[in-house]
Amino acid sequence: MQGVYPAIVTPFKDGKVDYDGLRTNIDYLIENGVSGVIPVGTTGESPTLTPLEHEKVIEKVVEFVDGRVEVIAGTGSNSTSEALEFSQYAEDVGVDGVLLITPYYNKPSQEGLKRHFGEIANSINVPIVLYNVPSRTALNIEPETIKYLFEEYSNITAIKEANPNLSQVSEVLDSCNIDVLSGNDELTLPIISLGGKGVVSVVANIAPKEFVQMVDFANAGKFDKAKEIHYKLFPLMKLMFIETNPIPIKTAMNMLGMPSGELRLPLCEMAESNKLKLQNALNNLGLLK
């Protein structure tokens, strides 16, 4: 995996998934050069989708993309059997890979992680992208575990690394050849400079062209040009996490007239003071017309 993979929102309208809006957003991203899309992850509000909605969104994204870019579907769970069912369904409807978050809340040991990911890897054929995000799961996939999984299972090929500890990224890249994608927009360039391949991005939902240019420059070793774009987008990167993701990105998309719609409880609308900060940043970037 290499390039920019937006973690796409799930647009809602009147309490239901807005599939027309989903198609519009996907077409926009593809037209602006992304390498793939990642539905039903954290940004896609997967925790508040019903299992049937989760599966239908995956199916519809595969249909809308129609082979133009990769579809890497979020199929993780803190239940191995549920993650396995979602992953098998995603494979059956034609995804190019699955994204598996570290089990959250129940906090398995590193041995438990090996068995969790291993059981799923043995049951599907499509590539697996591990997703390490300790800030949400309260659990870190240790570098030794990542190395073991990459070497033991041929279809575990990449990791979305959202641990901000660059020492961990260095250990992983020094120990094995797994593809590392930044799971944090702000750390995209540092991770690529260490040998990473790209980013699973939130900001790319609204600035895909700029993000693709930045990552392309970085992967070509043109870091001076990449840094110019990084610092241009940096205020927006920071604001995407001024409140819990995906509250800021959905708010920004609504401001820009892009299909996004409401949030599902327990997530709720952004504070007015933060909306103003976001609006100012969008104005400064020339995104608001």
From Swiss-Prot:
Pfam families: DHDPS. Its main location: cytoplasm. Its EC number is 4.3.3.7. SUPFAM superfamilies: Aldolase. One of its GO terms (biological process) is lysine biosynthetic process via diaminopimelate. Keywords: Amino-acid biosynthesis, Cytoplasm, Diaminopimelate biosynthesis, Lyase, Lysine biosynthesis, Schiff base. The record marks 42, 105 as: Part of a proton relay during catalysis. Catalyzes the condensation of (S)-aspartate-beta-semialdehyde [(S)-ASA] and pyruvate to 4-hydroxy-tetrahydrodipicolinate (HTPA). Homotetramer; dimer of dimers. This is 4-hydroxy-tetrahydrodipicolinate synthase. It comes from Methanococcus maripaludis (strain C6 / ATCC BAA-1332). The lineage of its organism: Archaea, Methanobacteriati, Methanobacteriota, Methanomada group, Methanococci.
